[in-house]
């Protein structure tokens, strides 16, 4: 195959409650499956609460409920913004690799970069587990005329091992995290990068991609990016709370300068067992969104069941932790 799989838009909805001039709008996109939709809604709310600039949001997903559509419409009305919802058919993506942790929804950003290049010149892509706590206004003035994207380098634990996995590409020191990417869509399209990404994903090197979409973006954009400072992608894993009995060390990472918090790892701020001060920014945004009365999410995957019982025990919920541990062991033994 020599081109990116054709992805059909099955349904398109737009809720426009803004008075935006398209020339000065910060366009922001998300690409998710149904398990991350609520996270997207709260992420959008967090952006709006911290920014008084023209905004337009694009959500690309393969499934959604009528309830989600209703809440997205409420969000647009509540904050006077424009939200476009793209329901896509993804059968053609079955040829691409996926992992136990990441579904093929990780490729939706590649579709977003390609499809939205027909509509807008620049696009900020955010993962659904990114929460905003500062101003994004400077991105509107960022000069991307000679670079394809603006990104933030990944953390040292990932950075220092990248050449072991991708030795042929010499990415160490410049490897970036793809959870926050500000893209020059004109140059993306001119360089046919979606097509090139697919060729890499379907090629012989694919087995070495631990983070398929992120690895491919790093390979294609090597020496073609501007590096933004850490506040634009402040990576924090809630797993670190298991070792921090004070639950205060997060403030060494998430601080007054932080603009975007990226909650990486299996435990997300919307999980029922993520009861820590470090997720207050997510909770504040949720309380100012249509999802304010939604219950926190329970464990769904075997990995989440494992994380749940560990966090409950650390929090001193011993009985609940033992029950959760039993539920994890049961699934581990009988639901392989």
From Swiss-Prot:
One Gene Ontology term of the molecular function aspect: lipopolysaccharide 3-alpha-galactosyltransferase activity
Pfam families recorded: Glyco_transf_8, Glyco_transf_8C
Cofactor dependence: Mg(2+)
Catalytic activity line of the entry: UDP-glucose + [lipopolysaccharide] = UDP + D-glucosyl-[lipopolysaccharide]
Recorded superkingdom: Bacteria
EC number, as in UniProt: 2.4.1.58
Biological or metabolic pathway of the protein: Bacterial outer membrane biogenesis; LPS core biosynthesis
GO cellular component, one term: plasma membrane
Keywords from the UniProt entry: Cell inner membrane, Cell membrane, Glycosyltransferase, Lipopolysaccharide biosynthesis, Magnesium, Membrane, Metal-binding, Transferase
Annotated motif DXD 1, positions: 127-129
Claim: Nuclease is one of the keywords in the record: no
Subcellular location: Cell inner membrane
Binding site for Mg(2+): 127, 129, 262
Disulfide linkage: none
Ranges spanned by the short sequence motif DXD 2, renumbered to the chain: 213-215
Principal EC category: transferase
Alphabetized InterPro entries for the sequence: Glyco_trans_8, Glyco_transf_8N, Glycosyltrans_8_dom-fam, Nucleotide-diphossugar_trans
Phenotype on disruption: The mutant synthesizes truncated outer core region, does not express the O antigen and cannot invade epithelial cells. LPS contains one glucose and two galactose units.
Biological process annotations from GO: lipopolysaccharide core region biosynthetic process
Residues bound to UDP: 31-36, 127-128, 262-268
PANTHER family, per the entry: GLYCOSYLTRANSFERASE 8 DOMAIN-CONTAINING PROTEIN (PTHR13778), LIPOPOLYSACCHARIDE 1,2-GLUCOSYLTRANSFERASE (PTHR13778:SF64)
Similarity comment: Belongs to the glycosyltransferase 8 family.
Role according to the record: Glucosyltransferase involved in the biosynthesis of the core oligosaccharide region of lipopolysaccharide (LPS). Catalyzes the addition of a glucose (glucose II) to the outer-core galactose I. Also has weak activity with UDP-galactose as the sugar donor.
Name used for this protein in its record: Lipopolysaccharide 1,2-glucosyltransferase
UniProt organism field: Salmonella typhimurium (strain LT2 / SGSC1412 / ATCC 700720)
Gene that encodes it: waaJ
